[in-house]
Amino acid sequence: VMGKLTREAVVEQALEIGSAEGLQAVTIRRLAQELGVTPMALYWHFKNKEQLLIGMADHLIEGFVIAEDHARPWQEQLRELVTGLVRVLRHYPCAAAVLEEVDHMTVPNFLRVWDTALGLAKQAGFSYEENCLISKYLLQGAIALAAGPMSRRPSASSEERAECLRVKRATLQSLPPDVYPHIVEMAGPLIDGGTTELYDTFGVDILMTGIETMAARLRTG
């Protein structure tokens, strides 16, 4: 087994454990146990947990790295980047925690994505200062989207979740309609919220519309 152990296999196992149980459960000892190797075999790939977290972050971002393409509209490419980030954050519930733990400057794929985002915002006509703000807002916006009310919580069963939603919906519907007319009227969608896909797509639309509107103002101003 040790001969077959790859850096990628270690990282993927770490992401699985982190997503199911939280990052604190990701230890060299636990990983070695899950992978059927000795801790020393893992130190060959990662000398400590900090290096492992950097590897995890790099692997996460690898899934949506795109190179800046001047032949395609910048809006399309920026949307692709943000959508890719949200998709990765959704797939691995521990992803946001991993990205918060690491120094982004130590993660090669993060630097690639960051550089691409800055280049795309520059194409849109923003100043250097604005480019930097946009890249930060997009990262934080994607993290907030994926951590929002549609995020999956592995601890709750589907039955428990359905019952919890039913109680919340009934609570809102029982509010006095003369005081909270709109909450009572929209109690269903407020609690059910539609699909995760709709939630994420709408959220990315809001982020991108803000940037596109400001870029259009720059062109007309």
Protein language model regions, located:
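C-terminal peripheral helix-coil segments that are non-catalytic and often amphipathic
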Residues: 123, 151-221
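Short, basic, alpha-helical segments at the C-terminal edge of helix-turn-helix-like DNA-binding modules
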Residues: 59-63
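A contiguous pocket-lining binding segment that forms or flanks enzyme active sites
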Residues: 116-170
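Amphipathic alpha-helical segments used for helix-helix packing
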Residues: 55-57, 86-106, 116, 147-154, ...
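Amphipathic alpha-helical interaction segments
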Residues: 9, 51, 80, 112, ...
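Helix-turn-helix
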Residues: 9, 13-51, 55
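Hydrophobic alpha-helical connector segments
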Residues: 65-112, 128-131, 135-138
